[in-house]
Amino acid sequence: MVILFQLALLLLVVMSFVLIVGVPVLYATNGDRVQSNRLILVGGLAWTALVVLVGVLNYFVV
């Protein structure tokens, strides 16, 4: 269970860095706005799910 918690936490940190860099880049590009907004929404939802998962796993680990 500890390894699963550590992997989820690592994934959360990596996803946070990707979103910190990716969101401004996607907003600054002149590409397809609908696809960019969808990508940002999916990234935000995945990040939120990871926060909840880390919280639940933290309850079981500690």
UniProtKB/Swiss-Prot annotation:
Membrane topology qualifier: Multi-pass membrane protein
InterPro entries: PSII_PsbZ (IPR002644), PSII_PsbZ_sf (IPR036512)
Main location: membrane
Record's subcellular location: Cellular thylakoid membrane
Keyword terms: Membrane, Photosynthesis, Photosystem II, Reaction center, Thylakoid, Transmembrane, Transmembrane helix
GO terms classed as biological process: photosynthesis; photosystem II stabilization
Stored Gene3D superfamilies: Photosystem II PsbZ, reaction centre
Cellular component, GO, one term: plasma membrane-derived thylakoid membrane
Transmembrane feature ranges: 8-28, 41-61
Protein family (similarity comment): Belongs to the PsbZ family.
Assembly: PSII is composed of 1 copy each of membrane proteins PsbA, PsbB, PsbC, PsbD, PsbE, PsbF, PsbH, PsbI, PsbJ, PsbK, PsbL, PsbM, PsbT, PsbX, PsbY, PsbZ, Psb30/Ycf12, peripheral proteins PsbO, CyanoQ (PsbQ), PsbU, PsbV and a large number of cofactors. It forms dimeric complexes.
Function statement: May control the interaction of photosystem II (PSII) cores with the light-harvesting antenna, regulates electron flow through the 2 photosystem reaction centers. PSII is a light-driven water plastoquinone oxidoreductase, using light energy to abstract electrons from H(2)O, generating a proton gradient subsequently used for ATP formation.
NCBIfam families: PS_II_psbZ
Protein name as it appears in the record: Photosystem II reaction center protein Z
Organism per entry: Synechococcus elongatus (strain ATCC 33912 / PCC 7942 / FACHB-805)
Gene that encodes it: psbZ
